[in-house]
Design a protein with these regions (language model features):
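Conserved N-terminal beta-strand and adjoining loop/helix that marks the start
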Residues: 1-21, 72-74, 90
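Active-site-adjacent beta-strand/loop module that shapes the phosphate/pyrophosphate-binding cleft
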Residues: 16, 75-98, 128-132, 136
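A short coil-to-beta-strand element that immediately follows conserved catalytic motifs
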Residues: 63-72
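A short beta-turn/loop motif at secondary-structure boundaries
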Residues: 29, 77-81, 103-104, 146
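Conserved Nudix-box catalytic region and its N-terminal flanking loop in Nudix hydrolases
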Residues: 19-58
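NUDIX/MutT-family hydrolases
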Residues: 100-133
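Short connector loops at helix/strand junctions that flank enzyme active sites
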Residues: 7, 15, 32, 37, ...
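Acidic/histidine-enriched, glycine/proline-rich intrinsically disordered or flexible terminal extensions
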Residues: 134-146
Length: 146
């Protein structure tokens, strides 16, 4: 029997007034063409905070201090091949201006009204952004019966 191990990922919510920063995925093999948040996997031996800081700098060129990150939501989800635990962090201040640092994996950036996300936003991202307004935890594709 193989040992079950979910993948841990971080999502970074960067706000500007009532808008959030989205990036459009490309050349990744997963949801290419769809809008999402800056995000990535937590590497072996890395804390979730460190991963969020690293991903923000790698993907959008901003520098975030650990004290500027607030954990606002946890999503436990199952995709076709993997199970994820996604930690969603909201950013309260950063240095720099968001720019597309990975044009090979990101077609562009945009600021979007949270209440009017693009039609082609990743479905689980839309669900999580809506759900986190009233809850701190959600699950998708899993047995939720108690």
């Amino acid at each position: 029997m193989s040992k079950f191990r979910p993948f841990l990922a971080v999502y970074i919510i960067v706000r500007q007034q009532q808008r959030i920063l989205l990036l459009q995925r490309q050349n990744t093999g997963f949801d290419d063409g769809k809008w999402s948040l800056p995000a990535g996997h937590v590497e072996e031996g890395e804390s979730a905070l460190t991963a969020a800081i690293r991903e923000a700098e790698e993907e959008i060129g901003i520098v975030i201090s650990p004290s500027a990150l607030k954990l606002v939501y946890t999503l436990h989800r199952k995709s076709d091949e993997r199970t994820y635990i996604d930690l969603w962090f909201e950013v309260d201040g950063f240095d720099g201006v968001p720019v597309n640092q990975e044009p090979n994996k990101c077609a562009g950036l945009m600021w979007s009204d949270l209440q009017n996300l693009p039609e082609n936003t990743q479905e689980y991202v839309k669900i999580a952004l809506k759900d986190m307004q009233t809850s701190h935890y959600g699950s998708l594709g899993l047995d939720t019966e108690c």
